[in-house]
Curated annotation (Swiss-Prot):
Subcellular localization, as worded in the UniProt entry: Cytoplasm
Gene Ontology molecular functions: ATP binding; metal ion binding; protein folding chaperone; protein-folding chaperone binding; unfolded protein binding
Subunit structure and binding partners: Heptamer of 7 subunits arranged in a ring. Interacts with the chaperonin GroEL.
Taxonomic source organism: Streptococcus equinus
Name of the protein this chain belongs to: Co-chaperonin GroES
SUPFAM superfamilies documented for this protein: GroES-like (SSF50129)
Leader sequence residues: none
Length: 94
């Protein structure tokens, strides 16, 4: 399991469905601009200029929304995960 450093977050991005309910295949231009992901692991947080630790706003298990193409994909055992900075997370799904 990966342990992210600083303000980085490890996410498991949900697979996008390639077909609609009617069975039509979506063209590349019609894909969503955002993705839903589950937080797998969270770093300790960011440090301010004075050295104070700012705790992360997300926790393992949270479902979040990120933009497509953000972060770095990494292979962790048999899973592919994405590492992003906390600032790249747009929202937490309630």
């Amino acid at each position: 399991m990966l342990k992210p450093l600083g303000d980085r977050v490890v996410l498991k991005v949900e697979e996008e469905k390639e077909q609609t309910v009617g069975g039509f295949v979506l063209a590349g231009a019609s894909k969503e601009r955002t993705q839903v992901a589950t937080v797998v692991a969270v770093g300790d947080g960011a440090r301010t200029l004075t050295g104070e630790l700012v705790a992360p706003s997300v926790a393992a298990g949270d479902k979040v929304i990120i933009e497509n193409g953000v972060g770095i994909e990494v292979k962790d055992d048999d899973n592919t995960v994405t590492i992003v900075r906390e600032a790249d997370i747009l929202a937490i799904l309630a």
